[in-house]
């Protein structure tokens, strides 16, 4: 019987995984310079964590979670997002006791949602995300956004834009929710069933509806920016000021509400408008979540973060036809002639690898011509040719595949020679 991967998943094969490692390294190195430290949380958590943290009324909790019972009847869920687990770890491990705040965390790993698979959307997908917990400072909001934009810039993307909104504090949102209910209620029957169910539970999510986005009431809906109280408006102005100071352009979209219940104040998305996508595509999204830490059992600690899809980042790179500097080939391939040379090459290739020189030998007993073809397929910069005569003389021939130049060197000096040539 032939087995196939489950629908909505993918195999990331050698070659493609090099691209993944490259962008993940950009993420890790950017986090290092911004002083964000990696956190690794379990793949599954107690279901209640996501119900409380993400929001009972969200599509994620109601429709998309992979939930199961273990052998003792406990309800567990494969993580659909990273923030709730990071905040749970922040609380459980008392990271709030650290004298230096905010606590800056990042994560990279698979998430799981039962969604309809389509281009760039999978049921197992990979996210990079950061969380800054313990500070309510507009400068932190700007820092988080700047970090995300820095990653896209380093990955070579040019067609990205930042879209920004403020969801205000609790009082601002209360006034705005009342205005939305008043606006939509008389004609709510014209909207989809999801919007109808959200009218009195979470009317902001109506603005996020894909089915009814062209409805005339969507276009005339009140703007949350008109309902921000003085404190919320001042906070948003400061965030915008810092972004301007950093030279990061942005657009304001008062209908940007994000799909999770925990957001307040700053909300943002980073989008690609590359022609290769055919439509504007969201690459990353995030915002401030003051109150979430307390909501899932911790002390009062404001926070902000974002998550970005690694699959969509790579798709954006392809859409812009950006070449990543991967698949550069190996440093050295050792061609052997004769059994004694082959036996010696096993220890020789080990020494090269231990010295940091990526190397390979023949494991298929190919003739010399076949070994040279393999060296070419692997993109070897140098080809070291070792026969039994050379071995007896403690010599080896080294060919530079770029220039065609070939020379004989002492075997014991091979590592030194290859390292010197690598620097040229």
Swiss-Prot record:
Q: Can you provide one Gene Ontology molecular function annotated for this UniProt record? A: catalytic activity, acting on a protein
EC number(s): the record gives 6.1.1.21
Compartments annotated for it: namely:
Cytoplasm
The record's catalysed reaction(s) read:
tRNA(His) + L-histidine + ATP = L-histidyl-tRNA(His) + AMP + diphosphate + H(+)
The record's annotation in Pfam families points to: HGTP_anticodon (PF03129), tRNA-synt_His (PF13393)
One biological process term from GO is: histidyl-tRNA aminoacylation
Gene Ontology terms, cellular component aspect? cytoplasm
| Keyword line | Aminoacyl-tRNA synthetase, ATP-binding, Cytoplasm, Ligase, Nucleotide-binding, Protein biosynthesis
Give the protein family. Answer: Belongs to the class-II aminoacyl-tRNA synthetase family.
| Binding partners and assembly | Homodimer.
Q: What is this protein called?
A: Histidine--tRNA ligase
Instruction: State the encoding gene.
Output: hisS
